[in-house]
Amino acid sequence: MPRGPGSLLLLVLASHCCLGSARGLFFGQPDFSYKRSNCKPIPANLQLCHGIEYQNMRLPNLLGHETMKEVLEQAGAWIPLVMKQCHPDTKKFLCSLFAPVCLDDLDETIQPCHSLCVQVKDRCAPVMSAFGFPWPDMLECDRFPQDNDLCIPLASSDHLLPATEEAPKVCEACKNKNEDDNDIMETLCKNDFALKIKVKEITYINRDTKIILETKSKTIYKLNGVSERDLKKSVLWLKDSLQCTCEEMNDINAPYLVMGQKLGGELVITSVKRWQKGQREFKRISRSIRKLQC
């Protein structure tokens, strides 16, 4: 027998024994009446909602995704925001939209409460802004019902600031190692490529970050066993990055000095440093790299 929906949802249902009609939330689309046949098991590879307290979700979801493929493609981009731990209920809020709970005895959709959205937005919108992304219109809190309606509530204040929660570890490639010029040159000689790049797009596949480069803003400093054909793909990888944070690479509009190795046909980043425009250190490093013979 599958387990029940969890204490949170039981509390929601208990407080609303007599339900009126609830409107679907398809942003800019007509209301939609869900049917029980639209309940789907939450797949194991929907990592955004891994460990959520219910097992079945509705399709289409509250963001208008009609297939599981769409959900998986779009949900991965939000995993880093959860990893930033800007609010304890970020995952709950996002999963209530990407994978809304589906209960056997309830045909209506359960949306996130207005207060849940407001709290998450207040804490997480500044984090998104630092990455160059505004809070999207589809997540505007005025779209969600007030707390006296049937909705997913904010956690109790007892759980807002977990005292024992460990700080997320920093990705090895993103650690500030306080290297001098000699250290940087030594690191470069150990790697297969060194590039100055700007980021066009970041996506997330399984546990890894896929970084798509702006092709016209790329400067090549070193290639060893890496062909021009490899670089034409304009794709770099930051491995296992969803298990750690990378503050060094938190601005999609900034240029970066990246070094790495070719592993299994992929260009994998082992070191990343934000390139401060006009900074003397990077101008000096740039000259040193061009003269370097490993």
From Swiss-Prot:
Residues 1-24 form the signal peptide. CDD domains: CRD_SFRP2 (cd07446), NTR_Sfrp1_like (cd03580). It comes from the Eukaryota. It is found in: Secreted. The keyword Disulfide bond applies. GO terms for biological process: BMP signaling pathway; branching involved in blood vessel morphogenesis; canonical Wnt signaling pathway; cardiac left ventricle morphogenesis; cardiac muscle cell apoptotic process; cell-cell signaling; cellular response to X-ray; chondrocyte development. The keyword Lipid biosynthesis does not apply. Residues 34-154 form the FZ domain. SUPFAM superfamilies: Frizzled cysteine-rich domain, TIMP-like. Belongs to the secreted frizzled-related protein (sFRP) family. Soluble frizzled-related proteins (sFRPS) function as modulators of Wnt signaling through direct interaction with Wnts. They have a role in regulating cell growth and differentiation in specific cell types. SFRP2 may be important for eye retinal development and for myogenesis. This is Secreted frizzled-related protein 2. It comes from Canis lupus familiaris. The gene is SFRP2.
